[in-house]
């Protein structure tokens, strides 16, 4: 979703409905009184209840107008045997009720009802609920006004879930019980309708505004179906779309509110005969595409690639709008065609190399693939595409990114089919959310540029389009054991993983000497990613997480505590200027590593210095970066860090990583664009407490616009252009003294696991039950359109795919079995020298990006069989004899490696459990035996994988 102009209407005409059904409301902006005011606050209202947790938490606390103070609420007794409770309001006279607001302290009620009575004896259920409130602020709208003198909230059951502590706290707790005679005007809004013109076009008419109000159209969740101006595009399948409006009282009697409607949008108009013919001959929607396509209209028969496959690339079609941008897009289109060809060849889809020609649609013949620009009037937007599959395959998009996604879909269809065939039909495909992301901390643990490329390629396969790279950080000082003094804290591990010219007066460099990306290779990575349809978002994190900077410039470190020295003292102007210089270097037009980045992350999380100084610093860095034409992203912290300065929301994207540091509703109402990165659902800390994502939870409960924990849930409307999407993140917190030996392959494995479910939910696909879930999770979900995904972790034909040989780096990835017959010469030097070290004997080795990568017959520190990778060495409890043949078998799995000697299990190193040493080993095959740097002997090697030899 992009920033869009909002349409305003103060009145309007209703037209005939064409397939338009209202299914529900989605409201933001709380009702604060309206014309009638809160009747529960009236004189003479009596509140009673069945029980209290303690005397001070009585029923009258629920009508005192205080909805924030914990001591000002009603709380029932904590009865584990009987969780049924009630709170009742008695009014001095009969009232009319249309609207009730319940402000829960906890959302643990799972069965309850609102009841009304004229005499307190005969009760009528006004509304009943069988699930927990969606949010702690619950609004109950009655279809018609009800006369009553008594209102009662009856609770029948309370959750017993351990995750929210309901198993311990069976009491019900309510801040406020509010009662209103009038509904907010938003609930009076007429439903929007679709109108058809004589020319055949369709559009969504603005709903009529109630008298004294104006209505603003905010947008649709599927803007490729209903555009920002109300245009209803020609879809090929019926779609359900949620649209949102803002209702504003022109006299200010009510706070502005948002209201949503769910609309069924029919496919483009067809005659009954056409529909009947389509249904008769329609191919089913192919199931091999992940995430599944948004719209499908089946044809009859199959498309088969030609024996000498050809791709026609229509570069001229991208020159129509802008010569400058068109030339750039034309080159990217050529690069995308080459990428398609290369990937198809590498994963065995094509038996022969595809020949790429420049041409037009007229040049396309049976068996060909065509790539070209679509008309802007089709509403495909930034990433949508169409794929018309007949005896040829025609892929069109308004933007080159859409072309990439069309190519990915075709690759998946071809790999799922037989003999390079695909069922004929038409695809119209597009995402639900703009940001579908993944991020990785490369600072606390180095991550090679090769692994970033592997991740990029797999992200693109799943149409994940946003790749965040966290470039600087340090060991968490609070858990480092190095905080006896500021000077000791300064010795903790830290790294800045990007080439920089910055040096202190002693000549010490900011750039990590262990491993860092050069400016040119990082710039090339950003540029290459665009060909894959992915935006790279680089991050320099300040003013916290900055020990790599304050270690060089200790005079700029915040000194409020020993643990604060990894934060920059913003009171010092010289320190702020230093950060500005760092950004100017990274953004430099000709040489900056970020010069081609469209979005950059300026950090800004977990700062414990003075709040207003922080906010002014944030605004200053934001303005500097946006001055170079780039959008800014940051870690939301404005709810937790006080101050009066609010940075402009224009082109500013906020990662909502903690609802304490940045309340999503508060940030939404402040106008910021939001990305769901909530830590308890989307953070991975390999080897630590968040070792892997909970795929079951993501499948069953999580949604990109849903922010929730054990006690709170807030929904940000998906129809709003401010709700950008979601991203998950790997944080290498287990570093320094907490290092658990996590390898790059461990990172990759955890990165890949949730991709199917997350890509499906972010693209907008219904997803199927994961293969490893039991039947208790319910049947597979999906819709009759075929928009269902696959939740198992399917094999991806790129990167560290776990299918055997990792060809790009000549290595075997887990799960593998390496069988070696090894003969160490009798005269081989294996005795320890005077320094206590042994002459290493290397059986296999490869070129590591930043450390040795080898399997030893004799490990130099111990003389035992062992291996080293990524700066960490492991040895088995076994010493290889000289002068005899020995059969060694190495079995590598996630986290562990087991050594067998002559078919007898000898030793296992490592574990796959959190907080335990990991020893995952990608076995190098680049140089084996006498090809290595030193091996005195002979060997034979046989490699087997769990699926493939």
Placement of each model-derived feature along the sequence:
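Aromatic, loop-rich ligand-recognition surfaces of beta-strand-rich domains
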Residues: 11-12, 29-33, 66-127, 131-184
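Acidic, contiguous N-terminal accessory segments
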Residues: 264-401, 409, 413-428, 633-641
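Feature activates predominantly on carbohydrate-active enzymes
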Residues: 378-565, 583-597
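Short tryptophan-centered beta-strand motifs in secreted/extracellular beta-sheet-rich domains
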Residues: 467, 525, 529, 820, ...
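Active-site neighborhood of glycoside hydrolase catalytic domains
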Residues: 559, 564-652, 657-664
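Extracellular glycan-recognition modules
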Residues: 795-866, 939, 943-949
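Flexible glycan-contacting loops in extracellular carbohydrate-active proteins
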Residues: 908-941
């Amino acid at each position: 979703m992009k920033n869009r102009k909002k349409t305003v209407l103060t009145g309007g005409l209703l037209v005939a409905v064409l397939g338009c059904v209202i299914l529900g409301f989605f409201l933001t902006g709380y009702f604060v009184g309206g014309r009638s005011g809160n009747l529960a606050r009236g004189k003479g209202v009596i509140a009673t209840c069945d029980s209290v947790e303690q005397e001070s938490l009585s029923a009258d606390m629920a009508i005192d107008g205080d909805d924030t103070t914990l001591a000002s609420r009603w709380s029932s007794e904590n009865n584990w045997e009987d969780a049924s409770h009630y709170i009742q309001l008695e009014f001095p006279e009969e009232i009319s009720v249309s609207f009730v607001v319940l402000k829960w302290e906890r959302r643990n009620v799972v069965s309850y009802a609102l009841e009304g009575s004229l005499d307190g004896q005969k009760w009528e259920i006004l509304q009943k609920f069988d699930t927990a409130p969606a949010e702690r602020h619950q609004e109950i709208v009655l279809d018609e006004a009800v006369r009553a003198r008594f209102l009662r909230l009856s609770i029948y059951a309370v959750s017993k879930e351990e995750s929210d502590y309901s198993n311990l706290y069976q009491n019900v707790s309510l801040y406020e019980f509010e009662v209103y005679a009038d509904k907010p005007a938003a609930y009076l809004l007429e439903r929007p309708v679709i109108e058809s013109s004589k020319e055949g076009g369709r559009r969504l008419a603005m709903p009529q505004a109630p008298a004294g109000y104006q209505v603003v159209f905010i947008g649709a969740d599927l803007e490729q179906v209903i555009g920002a101006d109300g245009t209803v595009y020609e879809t090929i399948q019926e779609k359900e779309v949620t649209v949102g409006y803002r209702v504003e009282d022109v006299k200010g009697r009510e706070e502005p509110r948002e209201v949503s409607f769910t609309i069924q949008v029919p496919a483009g108009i067809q005659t009954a005969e056409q529909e009947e013919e389509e249904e008769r001959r329609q191919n089913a929607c192919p199931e091999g595409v992940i995430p599944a396509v948004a719209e499908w209209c089946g044809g009859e028969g199959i498309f088969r690639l030609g024996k000498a496959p050809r791709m026609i690339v229509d570069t001229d079609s991208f020159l129509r709008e802008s010569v400058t941008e068109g030339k750039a897009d034309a080159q990217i289109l050529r690069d995308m065609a080459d990428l398609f060809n290369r990937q198809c060849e590498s994963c065995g889809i094509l038996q022969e190399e595809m020949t790429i020609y420049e041409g037009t649609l007229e040049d396309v013949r049976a068996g060909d693939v065509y790539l070209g620009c679509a008309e802007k009037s089709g509403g495909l937007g930034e990433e949508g595409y169409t794929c018309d599959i007949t005896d040829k395959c025609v892929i069109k998009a308004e933007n080159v990114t859409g072309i990439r996604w069309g190519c990915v879909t075709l690759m998946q269809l071809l790999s799922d089919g037989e003999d390079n065939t695909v069922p004929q039909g038409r695809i119209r495909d597009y995402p639900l959310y703009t940001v579908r992301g993944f991020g990785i901390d490369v600072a606390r643990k180095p991550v090679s540029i090769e692994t970033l490329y592997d991740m990029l390629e797999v992200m693109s396969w799943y149409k994940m389009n946003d790749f965040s790279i966290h470039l600087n950080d340090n060991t968490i000082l609070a858990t480092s054991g190095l905080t006896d003094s500021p000077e000791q804290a300064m010795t903790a591990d830290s790294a800045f993983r990007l080439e920089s010219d910055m040096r202190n007066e002693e000549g010490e460099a900011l750039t990590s000497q262990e491993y860092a990306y050069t400016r040119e290779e990082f710039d090339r990575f950003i540029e290459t990613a665009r060909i894959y349809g992915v935006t790279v978002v680089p991050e320099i994190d300040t003013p916290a997480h900055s020990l790599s900077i304050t270690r060089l410039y200790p005079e700029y470190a915040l000194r409020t505590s020993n643990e604060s020295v990894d934060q920059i003292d913003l009171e010092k102007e010289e320190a702020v200027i230093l950060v500005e210089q760092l950004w100017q270097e990274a953004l430099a037009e000709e040489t900056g590593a970020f010069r081609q980045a469209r979005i950059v992350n300026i950090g800004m999380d977990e700062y414990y210095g003075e709040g207003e100084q922080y906010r002014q610093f944030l605004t200053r860095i934001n303005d500097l970066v946006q001055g170079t034409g780039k959008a800014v992203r940051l870690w939301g912290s404005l709810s937790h860090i006080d101050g009066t300065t609010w940075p402009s929301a224009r082109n500013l994207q906020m990662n909502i990583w903690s609802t304490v540091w940045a309340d999503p509703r508060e940030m939404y109402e402040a106008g910021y664009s939001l990305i769901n990165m909530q830590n308890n659902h989307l953070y991975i800390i390999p080897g630590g407490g968040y070792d892997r994502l909970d795929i079951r939870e993501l499948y069953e409960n999580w949604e990109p616009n849903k922010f929730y924990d054990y006690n709170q849930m807030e929904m940000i409307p998906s129809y709003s252009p401010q709700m950008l999407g979601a991203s998950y993140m790997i944080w290498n917190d287990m570093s320094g003294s907490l290092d658990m030996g996590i390898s790059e392959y461990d990172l990759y494995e955890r990165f890949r696991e949730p991709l199917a479910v997350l890509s499906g939910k972010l693209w907008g696909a219904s997803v199927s039950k994961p293969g490893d879930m039991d039947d208790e999770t319910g049947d597979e979900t999906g819709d009759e359109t075929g928009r269902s995904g696959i939740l198992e972790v399917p094999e991806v034909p790129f990167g560290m795919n776990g299918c055997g040989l990792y060809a790009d780096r000549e290595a075997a990835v887990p799960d593998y079995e390496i069988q070696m017959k090894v003969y160490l010469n009798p005269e081989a030097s294996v005795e320890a020298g005077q320094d206590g070290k042994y002459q290493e004997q290397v059986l296999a080795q490869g070129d590591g990006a930043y450390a040795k990568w080898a399997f030893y017959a004799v490990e130099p520190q111990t003389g035992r069989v062992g291996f080293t990778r990524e700066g960490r060495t492991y040895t088995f409890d076994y010493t290889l004899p000289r002068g005899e043949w020995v059969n060694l078998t190495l079995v590598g799995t996630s986290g562990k490696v087991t050594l067998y000697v002559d078919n007898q299990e000898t030793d296992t190193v490592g574990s796959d459990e959190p907080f335990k040493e990991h020893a995952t080993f990608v076995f190098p095959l680049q140089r084996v035996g006498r090809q290595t740097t030193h091996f005195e002997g002979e060997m034979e090697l046989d490699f087997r994988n769990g699926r493939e030899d």
